[in-house]
Amino acid sequence: MSNSIVIQTNSTVIEDMKQQYKHSLSPKTPQGGIFMAKVPSCTITAYKSGKVMFQGGRAEAEASRWQTVSQTPKTAVKKSVDSHRYAPPASIGTMSIVGSDEVGTGDFFGPMTVVAVYVDAKQIPLLKELGVKDSKNLNDDQITAIAKQLLHVVPYSSLVLHNEKYNELFDKGNNQGKLKALLHNKAITNLLAKMAPTKPEGVLIDQFTQPDTYYKYLAKQKQVQRENVYFATKGESVHLAVAAASILARYSFVKQFDELSKKAGMPLPKGAGKQVDIAAAKLIQKLGKERLPEFVKLHFANTEKALRLLR
């Protein structure tokens, strides 16, 4: 389902956005526009009026990244993303819960990793001491150092969807949102089985789609966790369980990515920018186009861009 969200912001934030999306800028800019950028499953268009439009399957997720820094009053962005019956209670930050998060969805090279973590309320001070916070604010070395300690402290379930399987499932009509839902649900149910008979006070999923859509994606699954499940964007700032899940998911992704680079016999860049197109073109020259599905998410625009570089 394609969404369209508009936020109102200022020129400073728009400049920050342009810098953030510099590797994804489109050469075309609409009339009255400052820039247009295309990232996986979302097109961002900023206008001189201060309006910024997000279109596509990840419109909500991309818009939510900017809503706290923009001058948007309490508008439809916040409402459309976080206003639902699955919103976490105000006290969730001090509860003993399972948190889940995913990494790798915006990277052309590499797998998708999802991790669910259980954090007992008594462990929250320890996690803070270990430096657990949003993994986006940590470099790979920091991630590795914290993750190695976390692995011995918290119960967790870690899943990796390798590129070949990812592409196979995508070709069968499963979009990225559905694949994420399947992995989150599987990681959560695996962890709950591992923890039994201990039961968490709740489950917090770092929200990537509307909860009703999430459960729609899981309609054919035999085992679906529904009891005390909450969804929130920027879940890592809501409870450290999500931040811990984010760190372990990134740690797993980095390890898998390093293995993939070794397999390719060349360094592979993260993200989905121009440097990725160049690396993919080199990889095709080196190993052949038929090997590409082992390394990349084929539905990304980078596939066609890499092939164009070789023509």
Swiss-Prot record:
It comes from the Bacteria. The keyword Nuclease applies. Manganese or magnesium. Binds 1 divalent metal ion per monomer in the absence of substrate. May bind a second metal ion after substrate binding. GO terms for cellular component: cytoplasm; ribonuclease H2 complex. Residues 95-311 form the RNase H type-2 domain. Transmembrane segments: none annotated. It is found in: Cytoplasm. Its EC number is 3.1.26.4. It is an enzyme of class 3 (hydrolase). Keywords: Cytoplasm, Endonuclease, Hydrolase, Magnesium, Metal-binding, Nuclease. Its cofactor is Mn(2+); Mg(2+). A divalent metal cation binds at D101, E102, D206. GO terms for molecular function: magnesium ion binding; RNA binding; RNA-DNA hybrid ribonuclease activity. Pfam families: DUF3378, RNase_HII. Its main location: cytoplasm. It catalyses: Endonucleolytic cleavage to 5'-phosphomonoester. One of its GO terms (biological process) is mismatch repair. InterPro entries: RNase_HII/HIII (IPR001352), RNase_HII/HIII_dom (IPR024567), RNase_HIII (IPR004641), RNase_HIII_N (IPR024568), RNaseH-like_sf (IPR012337), RNaseH_sf (IPR036397), TBP_dom_sf (IPR012295). Belongs to the RNase HII family. RnhC subfamily. Endonuclease that specifically degrades the RNA of RNA-DNA hybrids. This is Ribonuclease HIII.
